[in-house]
Amino acid sequence: MASGGHGQEAEKLRIIISPAKKMVVDTDTFACKEVPCFMEKTQILKDWICGLSYAEQKALWKCNDKIAQQNAERFAQMDLYRNLTPAILAYDGIQYTYMAPAVFEDGQYAYVQDHLRILSAFYGVVKPMEGVVPYRLEMQAKAAVNGCRNLYEFWGEDLYREVMKGDDIDENRDDSRDDSRVLINLASKEYSKCIEKYLRPGDRFITCIFGELENGKVVQKGVYAKMARGQMVRYMASINARQPEQIQGFDRDGYAFDPDRSSEKEYCFIR
């Protein structure tokens, strides 16, 4: 398998992950000094959701009454700039539990802040230490906002452009040079396609597959894949990964890199 993307700067490597539906509030661990960059669009979404009837909100969220009522109250009382929780602590799903950011060391926080980007239907792109409030909105939700047919159209190329931003990531760069931008994809298809659709020739987009062999085929199971994605973020932060090839050493929970089933676009880890 050929290797590539051997640039020197850490900022060239980006990791994308999905958000989690379940969110918590933690205003004590870290003070939030910044908010995500697309707050104007977030405000548009908030206003649109608040303008829906309760029945419409519940249909949008595809949930039971208890969860719908909780989120209707959240949106009615929502202040996007107060009582903020760092995003990496706010999302409370399986991959975040296994990432275990609450016990990161200082260097690991700095690493994820530089490299990790959380894709969100509500905020667009979120850096780990940016402050967010609990919300419920999935990218595939049927939300026709601002004349757009859905949220993929609403966000357009914004997520790609923001993920690719960095001191050494220049959208006008010469894509023929061997210093391509590298994205490690740990997101679900629902979110990764917000980026994939806009990839340029010089971009290197590597999806990590975490699976088990069943009858000679790689089978990826949802819960276990989420666990492994979280552990991969933690692993990358612990080794200060700067090149994609470094993540091939990932060995948590019995996984091992399988070069025969991997390619330039997919890194396959089997256990």
Model-flagged regions — what are they?
Residues 1-10:
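N-terminal amphipathic/basic-hydrophobic helices that include classical n-h-c signal peptides
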Residues 11-15:
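Extreme N-terminal starter segment of soluble prokaryotic enzymes
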Residues 16-103:
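Active-site helix-to-loop segments that bind/position phosphate- or nucleotide-bearing substrates
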Residues 101-263, 268-271:
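Internal, well-folded beta-alpha domain core
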